[in-house]
Regions:
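Gly/Pro-biased beta-strand-loop elements
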Residues: 1-104, 123-127, 154-253
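Short, charged beta-turn/beta-strand-edge "cap" motif at the junction between a beta-strand
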Residues: 35, 139-143
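Structural signal for conserved beta-strand scaffold positions within catalytic alpha/beta enzyme cores
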Residues: 43-46, 115, 136
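Short, basic/aromatic beta-hairpin or loop at an interaction surface
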Residues: 102-112
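Short beta-strand-centered segments at strand-helix junctions
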Residues: 111-125
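Loop/turn positions that initiate beta-strands
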Residues: 131-134
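Short, Lys/Arg- and Gly-enriched loop/turn segments at beta-strand edges
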Residues: 143-149
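Short, solvent-exposed mixed-charge patches
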Residues: 257-258
Length: 258
């Protein structure tokens, strides 16, 4: 499962009967404006380690116009935009792959493919078989149940999104109220903190916030959250030096890639 608005991949490994469902999630980079990642259902049709990259005619034309002509084939190696591993989708010319530009993860920097950190793509490549179904959605607002509490998680709406999710929040909440997981009866009639819903849809934080809890504000909820220590992902190469900081313009420059 890919949620473009969240810029995250969610993998649900098969479980044995009686075992809880495990979810593995990773951040991704997605298609930039003008090169949107498609939505819908597809499958993994092939996998390749150490892939070569054959840019499409449209990509080569774009780069030539920018004074950066591309070869017909980019061989495997550290400068290959596909990274070390690729899982090709049933949609021609689209794939889930690594990258030679890690700062582009979490940004819209691709020609429609889905990029992953070099340290993340390896595990997904090894775990996901050819033929596995893939669903790509664009859902900036998510509503569900955490025990008896209705929660809402919001992400920024993509800038070229034509649909209007802000106009459908009531419909989304009502569907969650009546969901089989949430149950019927009292849960279907649970009161919703509409002021908080408005606050988190206008100021998305990607945090699941309880929206059926009195007069709670977003700041109150965040202030009460337990503090945790940030840890580097496995195999990360950052040395902890906080003095080297990239500006937004530097990140976007690094994200621009074939």
């Amino acid at each position: 499962m890919i949620n473009l608005a969240a810029m995250r991949l969610f993998y649900f490994p098969k479980t044995k009967p009686g075992e809880p469902q495990q979810v593995i999630t990773h951040p991704i980079g997605i298609g930039r404006v003008g090169w949107r990642t498609p939505e819908g259902n597809t499958r993994i049709v092939s996998k390749t380690a150490a892939p070569a990259w054959t840019p499409t005619a449209a990509i080569r034309k774009e780069h030539a116009a920018d004074g950066d002509p591309l070869p017909k084939v980019v061989p495997p190696g550290p400068d290959n935009p596909m990274g070390t591993h690729v899982l090709r989708l049933g949609w021609p010319e689209y794939a889930i792959h690594g990258t030679d530009k890690p700062p582009s993860i979490g940004l819209r920097g691709t020609h429609g493919c889905l990029r992953m950190y070099p340290e993340d793509i390896v595990g997904i490549y090894d775990a996901v078989p050819v033929g596995a179904p893939v669903t790509v959605v664009n859902q900036p607002f998510l509503v569900g149940w955490r025990g008896d509490t209705l929660v809402m998680q919001t992400y920024p709406v993509l800038e070229d999104e034509k649909r209007k999710p802000h106009q459908r929040t009531d419909q989304l909440i009502n569907r969650a109220r009546k969901s089989m997981q949430g149950g019927y009866g009292a849960r279907a009639n649970v009161a919703v903190n509409q002021a908080l819903v408005a606050e988190i849809t206008q100021n998305p934080r990607a945090v699941a916030v309880p929206i059926s809890t009195g007069n709670l504000t977003l700041q109150q909820y965040l202030a009460a959250a337990p503090r945790v220590a940030n840890r580097l992902p496995q195999n990360a190469t950052w040395d902890g030096d906080m003095r080297r900081q990239l500006k937004a313009a530097d990140l976007m420059k690094k994200a621009a890639a074939p």
